[in-house]
């Protein structure tokens, strides 16, 4: 079965945000590097996806200089690097065409954020008929503030707020939502030791 690794938003933009200090997986680049090495060694496709917000002046604006793969990661020659402007790597991109032209039937998804772009891409891939594997320990997220929380609070206050959704809860919820419905949940070790 032909498969592709789809790496979603593992980019320097996230490291520039104050909440990265509370990331569930600050060493995500190492996990992704290990996956990429394995896929390359097996001659399998890798697609790198970057999130962009042109003209916003944020760390996701290409003008910021942070819209690039995290330090320690590099696309090899022939590996597509595509940009997206939504939470879904299929929407506003040519990802579907790349996968179809390569005869891909299974996608392996990893990236940032666990419950946003990585999960959304996973759900859409399943809806498009792909067999999907979600590499839970090669994703990362940060705490989510309650919808009624005041904006601009320091990270310590966000983390202390009992209404904040903590990273372990986010990851568990994502696993429950995806497993057996949209994807098979696997770990880096399981995929690299096959």
For every predicted segment, state its role:
Residues 1, 19-48:
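A short alpha/beta connector and helix-capping loop motif
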Residues 7-8, 44-51, 135:
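Short beta-strand segments at enzyme active-site cores
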Residues 2-4, 33-37, 41, 59-194:
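Active-site-adjacent betaalpha module
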Residues 13-17:
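Short acidic, Gly/Ser-rich segments with clustered Asp/Glu that frequently serve as metal-coordination loops
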Residues 22, 55-57:
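Glycine-rich, proline-tolerant flexible connector loops at the mouths of alpha/beta enzymes
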Residues 12, 53-55, 139-141:
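Solvent-exposed loop/turn segments at secondary-structure junctions
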């Amino acid at each position: 079965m032909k498969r592709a690794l789809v790496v979603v938003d593992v980019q320097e933009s996230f490291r520039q945000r104050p909440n990265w200090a509370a990331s569930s997986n600050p060493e995500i680049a190492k996990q992704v590097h290990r996956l990429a090495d394995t896929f390359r060694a097996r001659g399998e496709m890798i697609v790198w996806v970057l999130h962009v917000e042109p003209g916003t002046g944020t760390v996701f604006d290409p003008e910021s200089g942070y819209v690039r793969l995290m330090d320690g990661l590099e696309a090899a020659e022939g590996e597509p690097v595509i940009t997206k402007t939504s939470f879904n790597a299929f929407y506003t991109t040519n990802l579907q065409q790349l996968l179809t032209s390569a005869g891909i039937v299974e996608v392996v998804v990893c990236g940032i954020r666990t419950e946003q772009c990585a999960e959304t891409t996973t759900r859409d891939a399943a809806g498009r008929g792909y067999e999907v594997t979600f590499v839970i320990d090669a994703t990362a997220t940060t705490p989510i503030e309650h919808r009624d929380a005041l904006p601009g609070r320091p990270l310590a206050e966000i983390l202390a707020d009992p209404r904040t959704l903590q990273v372990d809860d986010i990851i568990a919820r994502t696993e429950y939502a995806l497993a057996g419905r949209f994807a098979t949940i696997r770990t880096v070790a399981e995929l690299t030791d096959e």
